[in-house]
Amino acid sequence: MNMKILILGQGAREHAIVKSLIRTGTSPKDILVAPGNKGIAEEVECAPDIDITDCLAVDKLALEQGIELAIIGPEAPLVAGVSDSLRAQGVAVFGPSKVAAQLEGSKSFAKQVMSAAGVPTGMARQCKTIDEVEQAMEDFGAPFVVKADGLAAGKGVIVTDDSKAALKHAAEYIHMGILVEEFLAGQEVSLFFLSDGKSVMPLTPAQDFKRAFDNDQGPNTGGMGAYSPLPWLPENFIQQIEDTVALPTINELTNLGAPFVGLLYCGLIITDRGIRVIEFNARFGDPETQVVLQRLITPLESLLYKAATGHLENASDAQFTQDVAVTVVLASEGYPASQAPVREIKGIKKAQRVSGVEICFGSEVGRVLSVVATGKNFEKARKRAYKALSKITL
C-alpha cells in the first residue's frame, strides 16, 4: 500500500508491530515510531523527544511527517484522547476514542458495558472505601480478587488468599476506586479482534503468563511470557467469542455513541460454568502481540488501515503460519515491585544468531526485552527461546 505510518509507543509490543509490518511487506522507510527505543531505532526512524500523551505534539508530528495511518500502542495515549485529536486532523487512526478506551481505562465502565450487552463475566462489586472492600471480600470469600478501577500498567490486580495483602493492595489504589470480584478458576486465553466500529476480525489466540516467577508464583506483572497457537481450544472457540463477546461489546459501544475502532483485547477464562470475560484492553497486549504477530502472514498494514477507515468487512480473514511462537520476557531484578538501575545488556548479537529467534526491545528497566522464538512445535520453539536467553546477561 506504501503509506507513511506512525506508531506511538516505546516497548517490545511496538517493536513487534514494527517487525510484523516489515515482515508482511511494509518498507522500513515508511515507518516512524515515537518515541521508540534503541532497538527499534536500529530498524526504523524514531522521534524520541515526543510526549505521546500530548495531543498537540502528536498532531504536529503527524502533520509534519505526512502520516496517513497512526497505530497507538499503549493505553495512556488512548485514555488521553490522542486518537480523537489525530482523527480531527484527518489522520486514519488504529486506536479507539477516549470514550471507547474507557473499556480498559475503567473496570467499572467495562462491567457496565458487559452487563448491557449480555457478555458473560464474573460477579463484581464497586467499592469506594476500605470498609466496602472488606465487606465485599467477606461476601465473595477467598481467593480474593481485588482490582484497581483504572490504569495501573498491568499491576492493578491482586489474586490472593491473604486478606491482609488484598486489603493493602486495595488501600494503594483506593483513590481510583476498587472492584472486588468473584474468583474464577480455569485456563486463561487472550484473543485479539480488529474492529472498525461495525464489524470485527479475530486474530489467533494466545496465552500469557502474568506471574513474576516460575511455576505461576509471585505477583502479577504486565506479562512475563506467552505462546500461540493454543491447540487445546475447542474447535468453535473463536466464533463463539466473536458472537457472544466481541460483537455485542462493539455494538453496545456504538449504541453509547462511542464506536470502537482499533484492537479489542478479550482477556478470557474457560471455567467449568463456561467462558467468562476477565478484562478488556483497548490495544495490543504485551507480550501476546509478540507471538500473535510473529505468526501473521497477511499484510498487517492493510488490515489495520481497513479497520481504521471502516472497511474491515471488505478484508479477507487474517492468515497465520502453522508454526508455534513462544516469547519469554527478560526483566530486571525486583520487577514489578521495584526498579533496578539501568545496566548494559550483553549478548544480544549471540542471541539473535539462534535459529528462529528475534529480539523485541522493551524498556531500560522492568521488562527489558522479549525473546521471540518459532518452531514446528511448542518444545522446539521454547527450547530456542531459552537457548537465546542463556546468551544474554543483564
Residue ranges and their predicted role:
Residues 156-293:
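Internal nucleotide-binding/catalytic subdomain
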Residues 41-44, 102-108, 213-214:
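Short, charged, surface-exposed secondary-structure boundary motifs
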Residues 1-98:
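ATP-binding N-terminal substructure of ATP-dependent carboxylate-amine bond-forming enzymes
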Residues 242-264, 281-356, 360-362:
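Active-site "cap" helix and flanking loop/linker of ATP-utilizing ligase/carboxylase catalytic domains
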Residues 94-156:
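A conserved helix-loop-beta module that forms one wall/lid of the active-site cleft
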Residues 364-394:
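Generic C-terminus detector
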Residues 46-53, 125-129, 158-160:
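Short acidic-hydrophobic, aromatic-tinged amphipathic segments that line or gate anion-handling sites
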